[in-house]
Amino acid sequence: MDLVTFLVLTLSSLILLSLWRQRSRRGRLPPGPTPFPIIGNFLQIDVKNFNQSLTNFSKTYGPVFTLYLGSRPIVVLHGYEAVKEALIDHGEEFSGRENIPMSEKINNGLGITFSNGNSWKETRRFTLMTLRNLGMGKRNIEDRVREEAQCLVEELRKTKGSPCDPTFILSCAPCNVICSIIFQDRFDYKDKDFLMLMKKLNENVKILSSPWLQVCNNFPLLIDYCPGSHHKVLKNFKYIRSYLLEKVKEHQESLDVTNPRDFIDYFLIKQKQANHIEQAEYSLENLVCTINNLFAAGTETTSTTLRYALLLLMKYPDVTAKVQEEIDHVVGRHRSPCMQDRSRMPYTDAMIHEVQRFINLVPNNLPHAVTCDIKFRNYIIPKGTTVVTSLTSVLHDSKEFPNPEMFDPGHFLDANGNFKKSDYFMTFSAGKRVCAGEGLARMELFLILTTILQNFKLKSLVHPKDIDMIPFVNGLITLPPHYQLCFIPL
């Protein structure tokens, strides 16, 4: 048999296998566009506007439909009712995490973000309990965030009102808050170890959320056999792992089991107490992966939201004026803002919620997976099937948020100007997989933004109407365009 004949037969077999697998599944799964062999629905999706593609498909096939990315079926949930029904009403069944090949290479099924089963449940339980023990929701962690906000203000003063790109400095503050929780100590913004750690973490988040990595995850052979940025992720994680293990070693040498100082201490104490069944959950490898997950989730997302918030506040100076008026009235100039102030600052609270709703940071959430065969709206979704929840369709629902494409803090205010909660506010996801650091992120956004606005006037380099708001969608995360501004001391 010559090479050409062999290749033709191999390709034909792959196409037939792909067709058979797709047809055998389609009778059970929700409807959707007809996929092509091997590549699935890739040609029917606008990769530059994936969210619009999902909206268009939902108009044809309804709020629950199936797409094929390669030969792999993806069930898409579009709209508040479908998302709520899955993540909240059937929370346990939809609490799985998709097996993402690149994440599997890094985490080996460990950590809190991409793990499943008992390992995920135990790690998440420990993480939430430890954050509470360290003062989440209390003055302890709040004081750390307030201290970091003041350090940020001092760094901004050093710009002396000159134009600057806020990207780096706004990344330092949330990263340092995580450092203080994990390692006990914060770092100077010029500390070499801190800068290198932040560089590696930020590079990995950007690469992992890039379109190329989404392609690699759908065609896993590319990871091992093709050059590309994914190799840098593995190299960066090797550095992060080595750095974290060195920190763990320092903690092991100075550990006082009666007086835990930080997240690592609590983990090491629990490790000593763990029985033989719990040993895997309390291994050093799981600690490293969990810390890496906390940094990735708690640094880039918060710093990007802060960066987007400043851009929106320059675009809408009337909103900024109302927020600063509220800060002057409630906080004044002689003390720093605290969390007790938030209940008396409804407009500021509404503005922060509207920033998160409007920017739609993670448009389609991290992919879920069903943990068992489930009948959902008369369809059968087999165990292990990937489920994508369109948070865009929830956060930009015109029934809940009139004119959803407009930035308007009034979306979260009632007729009397009081803050108004919304069940549609799912920026941190919902259900069993809701972000473990939601409370910390909310605290950081309020304290850092109010502290900046208490101390500075935000000056754009262009007229507000000329400020570019077109987001850069980097696969997983929506990023604001690059910009500069001046922080003018008040």
Swiss-Prot record:
Entry keywords, A to Z: Endoplasmic reticulum, Heme, Iron, Lipid metabolism, Membrane, Metal-binding, Microsome, Monooxygenase, Oxidoreductase, Signal
GO biological process: arachidonate metabolic process
Membrane topology reported for the UniProt record: Peripheral membrane protein
Subcellular location: Endoplasmic reticulum membrane; Microsome membrane
Species: Mus musculus (Mouse)
Pathway as given in its UniProt record: Lipid metabolism; arachidonate metabolism
The protein, known as: Cytochrome P450 2C38
CC per GO annotation: endoplasmic reticulum membrane
GO MF terms held by the record: arachidonate 11,12-epoxygenase activity; arachidonate 14,15-epoxygenase activity; heme binding; iron ion binding; oxidoreductase activity, acting on paired donors, with incorporation or reduction of molecular oxygen, reduced flavin or flavoprotein as one donor, and incorporation of one atom of oxygen
Tissue expression from the record: Liver, brain, kidney, and intestine, with trace amounts in lung and heart.
Physiological role: A cytochrome P450 monooxygenase that primarily catalyzes the epoxidation of 11,12 double bond of (5Z,8Z,11Z,14Z)-eicosatetraenoic acid (arachidonate) forming 11,12-epoxyeicosatrienoic acid (11,12-EET) regioisomer. Mechanistically, uses molecular oxygen inserting one oxygen atom into a substrate, and reducing the second into a water molecule, with two electrons provided by NADPH via cytochrome P450 reductase (CPR; NADPH--hemoprotein reductase).
